[in-house]
Amino acid sequence: MIEKHIVLEDIDPVIFYGVNNANIQMIKALYPKLRIVARGNVIKVMGDEEEMCAFEESIIALEKHCVKYNSLKEEVIIDIIKGKTPQIEKTGDTIVFSVTGKPIVPRSENQLKLVKEYEKNDMIFAIGPAGSGKTYTAIALAVRSLKNKEIKKIILSRPAVEAGEKLGFLPGDMKDKIDPYLQPLYDALQDMIPAAKLKEYMELNIIQIAPLAFMRGRTLNAAVVILDEAQNTTTQQIKMFLTRMGMNTKMIVTGDMTQIDLPSSQKSGLVQAMHILKGVKGISFIELNKKDIVRHKLVTRIVVAYEKFEEKQKEERLNDSKKREGDSNK
């Protein structure tokens, strides 16, 4: 009789073992000749060497399934241990699976375009209104790359100041000050990565969420780096960010041109970057619009209403300018 320890490295053991350890109990029942003890992320197994080799192969296959789908069902366990291919429901253009096992898919033509451009280019600019799914899709792509071990880390960043608020006047330490700005990024990650695994990734700096200023001086290798709310960067800030790109790295820059919170005297770095970098090989630009909005149906109506209001204001300013010009010529 020999003994072996198998470490579950890439998954949350709670999901793998199942509710009330139902999954591990089933695995034990399917390997009655082995003595199996599971504690934490380590499975200790004792028994015949040949039987143990088959057991280890099954555990590796089950772990891979669990990493991909964030779930492990009874019928899947039976199929894998019996050497069959699990019957998985076809999920089309699935990017990644949520913590509940549901497929996260592009929900519009432009979101699908973002997915395809990500596969072809190393730098993507995704511009569109609130709720168009640009950031959520970008994070899903990053999580997929991490799960597939194509990269070593995910770095998510935002400008730290939005809507006119200044960090120095907010209560708490630096983490307390910046966390509210970064919460939308946490929310997306929590949809896609089990809580215990996400906490581990963040403690090990495999997933990093930080204000844009924290990027200065770094070279980011083997990573997917996402800059969200890029319309609120200055020219110097976005140039600094884009030049952090290292080897085997992809960058996704997202922004909404209708929500620029910079002082009126300051130009948006995103606007300038789109003009300067247009036509550069390896950089893709995707524009999402109100048709891509996947929030409550009222959000689309609100966006349309504001577009009409802003267009009307633009016309009024133009008419006023023409009137003043006519008056000055009299």
Describe the function of each predicted region.
Residues I77, P86, G92-P106:
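Primarily NTPase-proximal linker/entry elements flanking Walker-type ATP/GTP-binding cores
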Residues N23, F55-S58, I238:
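Hydrophobic side chains in well-ordered alpha-helices
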Residues K33-I36, F285-I286:
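A short linear hydrophobic-aromatic micro-motif
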Residues A29, I36-T91:
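Interdomain "pre-motor" coupling segment immediately N-terminal to P-loop NTPase/helicase cores
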Residues I11, N21, E49-E50, N232, ...:
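Short, surface-exposed acidic/glycine-rich loop or hinge patches that mediate macromolecular interfaces
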Residues I11-Y31:
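Short amphipathic alpha-helix segments
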Residues V42, F97-E109, K113-L227, Q231-K330:
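Conserved helicase motor core of SF1/SF2 NTP-dependent helicases
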Residues M1-V14:
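N-terminal presequence-like segments and adjacent domain-start helices
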